[in-house]
């Protein structure tokens, strides 16, 4: 049964003060609440991802809070494009993050208000990788504003090409452009597609067929997550069970946790 396969939540956002964007989860987005739901969902591992200015996030203390909650939760730092983005300063920032216990950084173009053609984006990704940090790039590109159109799949394809052999996790995998992002990522074997948000938000739409296809034909390149508190890891468990029904068990394990654990290298605990 696929419900015996533990999950690795690729994108969780528990916050120090339990709050979130707007009033959606005011006071209810705590580490304790997330841990309880993760245990109920048989979710053994999670990337806990901070966002600048949200829920009391502080880079200096977030990693310690994550590690104190569970040895199987791994902190990811928010990368702010403000301030000095010179090579030496980036190296210093990433070294500090690594020394603080972070396993990666999250680049969120909408929140950071940057475009994928930002002149320091490629160096930032490369230097983070050199420091041993995984890079998570948000690919939910839809927002208001005169510059919003500049973040699109053409820009994403160009970015991957400029990076050459990028090691990236593409958060949300392009949402409604899922299959197109799959083909954009296909030539880059170290690019992992994260189905958080997309898996739950578009339930009942034509994307269900695309997700089913990817579980069966692209199972070595995808992972699942909640984007909590937008969606619960319990919702992810239910959706995972739907798509894993009748699936080769090895493919189900790939999607559930193996791909993401391989992507992160040796930082995660054994499957057990």
Tell where the protein language model's regions lie, with residue ranges.
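Conserved, mostly hydrophobic/aromatic
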Residues: 11, 38, 97, 105, ...
């Amino acid at each position: 049964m696929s419900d015996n396969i533990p999950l690795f939540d690729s994108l969780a956002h528990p916050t120090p003060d339990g709050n979130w964007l707007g009033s959606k989860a005011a006071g209810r987005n705590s580490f304790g609440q997330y841990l309880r739901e993760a245990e109920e969902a048989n979710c053994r591992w999670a990337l806990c991802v901070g966002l600048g200015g949200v829920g009391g996030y502080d880079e200096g203390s977030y990693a310690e809070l994550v590690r104190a909650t569970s040895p199987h939760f791994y902190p990811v730092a928010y990368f702010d494009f403000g301030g000095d983005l010179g090579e030496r300063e980036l190296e210093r920032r990433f070294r500090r993050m690594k020394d603080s216990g972070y396993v990666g950084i999250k680049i969120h173009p909408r929140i950071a208000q940057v475009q994928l053609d930002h002149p320091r984006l490629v160096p930032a990704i490369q230097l983070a990788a050199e420091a041993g940090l995984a890079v998570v790039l948000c690919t939910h590109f839809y927002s208001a504003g005169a510059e919003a159109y500049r973040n699109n799949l053409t820009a994403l394809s160009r970015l991957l090409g400029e990076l050459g052999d990028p090691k990236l996790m593409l958060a949300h995998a392009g949402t409604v452009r899922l299959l197109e992002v799959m083909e954009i990522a296909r030539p880059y074997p170290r690019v992992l597609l994260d189905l958080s948000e997309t898996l739950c938000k578009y339930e009942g739409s034509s994307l269900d067929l695309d997700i089913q296809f990817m579980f069966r034909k692209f199972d070595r390149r995808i992972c699942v997550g909640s984007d909590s508190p937008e969606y619960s890891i319990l919702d992810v468990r239910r959706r995972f069970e739907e798509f894993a029904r009748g699936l080769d068990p090895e493919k189900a394990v790939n999607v559930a946790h193996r791909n993401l654990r391989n992507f992160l290298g040796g930082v995660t605990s054994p499957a057990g």
